Amino acid sequence: MDSRMKVLKLFKTLHRTRQCVFQNDCRALEAARRRINEEFKKNKSECSPAKISELLKFGTDVEIVLRTSVVQGIHTDSNKLVLQARKDLLLDNIPFCDAPEKQT
């Protein structure tokens, strides 16, 4: 696949991920849309294959981080926040103990 196709595919993937991650949050959706478009326009005239592949790698990493790490929170009451976890969210089931360890 040539680089134009890869760039277009990444552009569309980032926008789809943005819509999924920031669902029902107009402010975050608009800010993410502007940032994605701005970054792609800034590098529109890039011709170096090495730089293009570096930017593609960076964009792919950003998409993965957005998809697996960002959690959307919704304010319900004055002191409550409800987190909406998606199926793509990276969940590590690591046991956690907040009690201090006993020293022997």
Swiss-Prot record:
Family: Belongs to the complex I LYR family.
BP term (GO), one: mitochondrial respiratory chain complex III assembly
This protein's UniProt keywords: Chaperone, Mitochondrion
Primary localization class, coarse: mitochondrion
Xref: CDD domains: Complex1_LYR_LYRM7
Gene Ontology cellular-component annotations: mitochondrial matrix
Native organism taxonomy: Eukaryota, Metazoa, Chordata, Craniata, Vertebrata
Keyword Mitochondrion attached: yes
Quaternary structure annotation from Swiss-Prot or TrEMBL: Interacts with UQCRFS1.
Compartment list: Mitochondrion matrix
Name the record gives this protein: Complex III assembly factor LYRM7
InterPro entries: Complex1_LYR_dom (IPR008011), Complex1_LYR_LYRM7 (IPR045298), MZM1/LYRM7 (IPR050435)
DNA-binding found in the keyword field: no
Role noted for this protein: Assembly factor required for Rieske Fe-S protein UQCRFS1 incorporation into the cytochrome b-c1 (CIII) complex. Functions as a chaperone, binding to this subunit within the mitochondrial matrix and stabilizing it prior to its translocation and insertion into the late CIII dimeric intermediate within the mitochondrial inner membrane.
